[in-house]
């Protein structure tokens, strides 16, 4: 088994925040009811950006923070989401196009809450079999 590690992370959060008060009013329940079941108090939301734009901003943050990350070395892009704005082409292909990455496998994983873990598992399998050397895994939802 190979020694595989996550070498860098990036993030992007839209500026609009929605707390449980909004959802409690909509669903006629208490804020505490939501928090006890989800552990979430506040969510970030964007009216003006689609899922593809959120993913690209996250990757730009990753590259900006980590000089050792060169998009041209990425040979696989895996995007995990439950809120894609289009099925084809997948978000991974739009990322590949945006960063002009050549010779790159693209895959979108639509698997609900476990999607990001599934995407990491896929990346690990490709690394262990030498089918990928620098996969990029992106988790993005709106």
Residue ranges and their predicted role:
Residues 1-21, 120-142:
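Conserved beta-strand-centric core segments of catalytic alpha/beta enzyme folds
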Residues 7, 58, 78, 107, ...:
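Hydrophobic/aromatic beta-strand patches that form the interior of the parallel beta-sheet core
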Residues 37, 41-53, 82-134:
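Conserved catalytic cysteine-centered active-site region
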Residues 75-82:
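Short glycine-rich or small-residue beta-strand-to-loop segments that form or flank ligand, phosphate
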């Amino acid at each position: 088994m190979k020694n595989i590690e996550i070498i860098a992370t990036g993030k992007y959060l839209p500026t609009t925040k929605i707390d449980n008060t909004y959802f409690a009013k909509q669903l006629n329940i208490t804020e505490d009811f939501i928090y006890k079941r989800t552990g979430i108090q506040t969510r970030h939301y964007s009216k003006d950006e689609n899922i593809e734009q959120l993913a690209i901003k996250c990757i730009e943050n990753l590259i900006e923070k980590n000089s050792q990350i060169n998009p041209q070395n990425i040979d696989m892009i895996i995007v995990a989401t439950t809120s894609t704005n289009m099925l084809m082409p997948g978000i991974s292909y739009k990322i590949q196009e945006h960063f002009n990455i050549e010779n790159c496998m693209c895959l979108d994983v639509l698997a609900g809450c476990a999607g990001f873990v599934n995407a990491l598992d896929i990346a690990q399998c490709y690394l262990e079999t030498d089918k990928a050397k620098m996969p990029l895994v992106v988790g993005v939802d709106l």
